[in-house]
């Protein structure tokens, strides 16, 4: 579908719609002589060395200029909104925020939540890995950038502004605020589609650089049964109109600063505070600025992402500046590495400050990718500076604008140092792994490591393709590393697996029923209730109201009984399907629609779930205070006997930290703080409490239930809770586990369950005291004494074993047989596998074969250097007669036979071989 986007401004001010003579796309211009759209490769950069904005701006100045312009606009004042975290806790379908509109998906766009302001203006740090392999090379690509944006949400019957006003606001900002020349600005028509939405759009171009995109989101992906008269085709996909029309703009902060400074690259304009120190540290020679300028200009002229190779760019730049490709490579490579390090470490600063913990999964994997890529670049530069020192430069520069960086500085730098140490250890282990894999490939007759194997080396073992290539080429194996290797692995990491939960009851069978009244929220202490049966579906029944809690949010379902016509029927499972709660019963045949029933929940089970659920919130508050603000809940589960809480944390929790966490949690219990809950509109809850609300994960709905422990913890939570912390009872941490890289699991118990655990421990201590015949307080020193005595006894046993081995060798030396030109010892002896191994090694001589078999069936074989036989083959001969298995090297083999009665026959078969 082609949108002809004639706006009010275009008509009134004499703009001309033309078709670009290079790409054929339509664009609007004030210049009657213009023939090209202004978008590379149709036009090259015209601002490098000649800034396109009269005043030079810093990042902070340009950001404030933009925000203030829209905030104070006379006709369309916008509400200024603070940046959102780059880790989007409010949604679970993406790993990182890659655009400002993602802050408001899905809840605001769908109409389920109100925007924080309407219209609004924001400058949102955004992270994208699609161009990671081009960062540092092209002069313009970043993994992290700020998308300045103004958004308007036009709900049905509540219009704010649309295409005309958006274009006018953009033009006003560029020409009146930034003093750009109107005749050099073009608006290129280019429909946009992404994330299931689409609409007409303008790319705003100035002197060869795209400085903004204005998207008018008004379509959503069409369902299969959509009426054909409503369907539009955009970029090959089917869409239907949305109820809410959204103005989705994006202005490149870094690009506008670059435009104002006209520096050779965008990195020089916005990352100088890291670039310059790195140049000094690396002792990089000053480069002819023409090289960087031409590199940026030419990189902008073609889509390097589609080339898959840098050779063409290098060749063109070298020709332009009159040097060889080799000279260009030598001059420009250190700069490219420095630019990439500066960008990657800035992205890391935002990611770690917002709670990303490096790991091998999800956003943690992407953080680790940046860390290891940066370390590799430092190594190539010959710099031995800790990566944390470079990250510290970002914190120092940016903390005034982003004060959270200073608050998190110690944690951020410690994480970086730990990751650098881990990577060093990985590289030491990795070399052997690569060589083993190369040996396997050679056996298969392969001469090159395939891409899939390179990806596995990186994803599973942290081995960069550059390191693999270095090792492989020494072994005579080729390695081709694609220029976009890191983009490939990042893309794979960003693919979220869609896990479809199996529905217990088909939604279609209950969608016409009214929402179930939730008595467990109205009175969490309600033990019995009356209700009416609305529907029977197989083993499941639907009631008009219920006190049975359905499974959800880490809290198991309630069980209990329903009384119907004098019968008591067990309720074995409770689930929620849409807004309807369904109960699984043992005898569904007793229930009929319209019947009145009485329910009774298993109170002992419920109250223990409530203790553990409220205890989870208490413990979470203690964890954040002891370990740091980077800690986020990564999962939880409750039972009646214990609960578990998974948290993001970059190292094991120490015993000292655990004691402090447990002490703090129990202090909050003893203080008997109030626990309250209320239903709040999503946007109001977020503005009041921040995104810490989503500790337990994404909570759907326009209105969300917020559970608050007085001055301690606030979470959006659908579980049942106690009215005060005192009712939780004692909290006992049972143990911690490292369930995956970057995630710690705390298993704990509350109330009666905690008391039972203490009683168990007391019983264990009592039994240990009885066995050792000492009081409990003497157990540690007694255990230590026994352990030391055991170690001494073990040493004596080892000495005796060695003496016995010497004796065995002495006896066996007397039993040497002469078989042709060889010496042969073949005996059935007493001893363990270790004894046999030591004996054959001691008996080994250049002209001798030794075969020893124990009465348990273990065997060991040694073959001297001058013997033309293979120990591995002899092991196979032995097991071919007596069964079992074994193997080894040419000179030594071991194993175990199945039939010891055939040991003598098997040994004699080896004599015959000689």
Curated annotation (Swiss-Prot):
Q: Which SUPFAM superfamilies match?
A: Class II aaRS and biotin synthetases, Putative anticodon-binding domain of alanyl-tRNA synthetase (AlaRS), ThrRS/AlaRS common domain, Translation proteins
Q: Which PROSITE patterns match?
A: AA_TRNA_LIGASE_II_ALA
Which cysteine residues pair off into disulfide bonds?
none
Write the Enzyme Commission number(s) for this entry. 6.1.1.7
Report the GO terms under cellular component: cytoplasm
Q: What does the entry's cofactor note say about binding and number? A: Binds 1 zinc ion per subunit.
Q: Which GO terms describe its biological process?
A: alanyl-tRNA aminoacylation
Annotated keywords: Aminoacyl-tRNA synthetase, ATP-binding, Cytoplasm, Ligase, Metal-binding, Nucleotide-binding, Protein biosynthesis, RNA-binding, tRNA-binding, Zinc
Q: Which residues cross the membrane?
A: none
Name the InterPro entries on file.
Answer: aa-tRNA-synth_II/BPL/LPL, Ala-tRNA-lgiase_IIc, Ala-tRNA-ligase_IIc_anticod-bd, Ala-tRNA-synth_IIc_core, Ala-tRNA-synth_IIc_N, Ala-tRNA_lgiase_arc, Ala-tRNA_ligase, DHHA1_dom
What GO MF terms are annotated? alanine-tRNA ligase activity; aminoacyl-tRNA deacylase activity; ATP binding; tRNA binding; zinc ion binding
Q: Which cofactors, if any, are listed as required?
A: Zn(2+)
Q: Which family is this protein grouped under? A: Belongs to the class-II aminoacyl-tRNA synthetase family.
Query: Which NCBIfam families does this UniProt record tie to the protein?
Result: A-tRNA_syn_arch, alaS
UniProt-listed HAMAP family: Ala_tRNA_synth_A (MF_00036_A)
| Free-text comment on this protein's domains from its UniProt entry | Consists of three domains; the N-terminal catalytic domain, the editing domain and the C-terminal C-Ala domain. The editing domain removes incorrectly charged amino acids, while the C-Ala domain, along with tRNA(Ala), serves as a bridge to cooperatively bring together the editing and aminoacylation centers thus stimulating deacylation of misacylated tRNAs.
Protein name, as recorded? Alanine--tRNA ligase
This chain's source organism reads Pyrococcus abyssi (strain GE5 / Orsay)
List the gene name: alaS
